[in-house]
């Protein structure tokens, strides 16, 4: 069905991949184009040939800049001299489509004018061209489709603001396993202590590339429990929000427990996580905020864009230990890894090779999904125990 709009009405429409599908497809054209189509139809049998692209393998985020002048005619040519190339993998966590938005602003701007989110099919890789130079960019991806296409994208995972050089050829992977609570390696936020106050903001969802997000902005229901203990006694419950925690001056042993629960058709991996960080802290000298030594584990899973690895043979799981920015790198480290193929009901210790901050675990063949339980510690007494149920899939 072809619908010709009146002369005083717009033919503008929006396609969405979700919703009811009618048995007869309909297309809308503007009045002037419609008149030519009607004239051709009146002359006899007319054929209309259409080429449609539902999911383009390319995307352009272009910023046209004219320094020190206002040109009479604005012309922008995308070239290798002014544009970076980024291959972006949009991870499939269960939903067939996702929202994404790359916010952009000039150095003198205080906020971005970008106001429209975009749709992208999950489980795909797209070649994206981004203007280089002095522009600031920040990419954000929500693992499913939101209800509003016109407001800025708030939820999901976010990268740190960055610039591109024209010769940059980079890759991004969104929602790559293992997604878990973590202090991002790419920057803020960093847990700190100022005097006798602890600021323990830890994003509940961080992927393998360091993109981070918060449960309250996740786009769907998630349960979070967070508690702080000092010398074995609970001193704060942060389950309702990350607020400063008052403490005492003397050196003490602290423990931060963070648990997440999220399971839906749109979220098949990392359905449950339990993380416990332990460290020692005393009142620091001065009034500046001092980063806290919450030992981190970064994971390197040889997964595809759907978050799965071949299950018919063993595979290697990479693990890297690090401290938050501002804390010396860990030394005298140890790592223990257990895996489960039945959702955490039974566990099996696996071989771990490596030293320093880089280790490799050999995960046995299996079916379904891999759950992980990792224990790591360093010479300073900092430790982390992290359990991720259904961390990634087996195909």
Locate the predicted segments by residue:
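Short strand-edge motifs at loop-to-beta-strand transitions and within beta-strands
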Residues: 243, 357-361
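Conserved Ser/Thr-centered positions that define the repeating blades of beta-propeller domains
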Residues: 229, 338-341
């Amino acid at each position: 069905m072809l619908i010709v709009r009146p002369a005083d009405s717009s033919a503008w429409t929006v396609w969405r991949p979700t919703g009811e599908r009618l048995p007869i497809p309909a297309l809308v054209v503007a009045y002037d184009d419609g008149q030519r189509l009607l004239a051709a139809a009146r002359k006899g049998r007319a054929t209309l040939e259409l080429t449609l692209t539902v999911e383009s393998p390319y995307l352009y985020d272009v910023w046209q800049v004219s320094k020190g002048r206002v040109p009479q005619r604005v012309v922008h040519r995308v070239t290798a001299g002014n544009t970076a190339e980024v291959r972006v993998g949009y991870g499939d966590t269960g939903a067939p489509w996702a929202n994404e938005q790359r916010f952009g602003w000039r150095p003198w701007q205080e906020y971005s004018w970008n106001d429209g989110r975009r749709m992208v099919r999950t489980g795909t890789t797209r070649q994206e061209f981004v203007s280089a130079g002095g522009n600031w960019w920040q990419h954000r991806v929500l693992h499913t489709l939101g209800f509003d296409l016109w407001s800025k994208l708030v939820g999901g995972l976010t990268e740190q603001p960055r610039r591109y050089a024209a010769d940059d050829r980079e890759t991004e992977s969104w929602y790559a396993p293992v997604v878990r609570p973590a202090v991002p390696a790419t920057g803020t936020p960093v847990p700190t202590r100022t005097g006798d106050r602890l600021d323990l903001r830890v994003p509940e969802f961080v992927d393998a590339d360091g993109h981070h997000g918060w449960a309250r902005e996740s786009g769907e229901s998630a349960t979070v429990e967070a508690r702080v203990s000092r010398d074995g006694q609970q001193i704060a419950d942060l389950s309702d929000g990350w607020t400063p925690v008052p403490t005492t001056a003397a050196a003490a042993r602290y423990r931060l427990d963070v648990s997440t629960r999220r399971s839906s058709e749109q979220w098949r991996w990392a359905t449950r996580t339990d993380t416990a960080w332990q460290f020692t802290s005393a009142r620091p000298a001065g009034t500046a905020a001092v980063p806290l030594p919450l030992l981190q584990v970064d994971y390197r899973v040889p997964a595809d864009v759907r978050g799965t690895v071949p299950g018919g043979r063993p595979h290697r799981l990479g693990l890297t230990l690090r401290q938050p920015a501002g804390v010396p790198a860990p030394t005298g480290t140890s790592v223990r890894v257990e895996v489960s193929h039945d959702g955490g009901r039974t566990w099996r210790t696996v071989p771990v090779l490596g030293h320093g901050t880089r280790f490799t675990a050999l995960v046995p063949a299996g079916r379904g999904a891999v759950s992980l339980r990792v224990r790591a510690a360093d010479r300073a007494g900092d430790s982390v125990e992290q359990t991720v149920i259904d961390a990634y899939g087996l195909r």
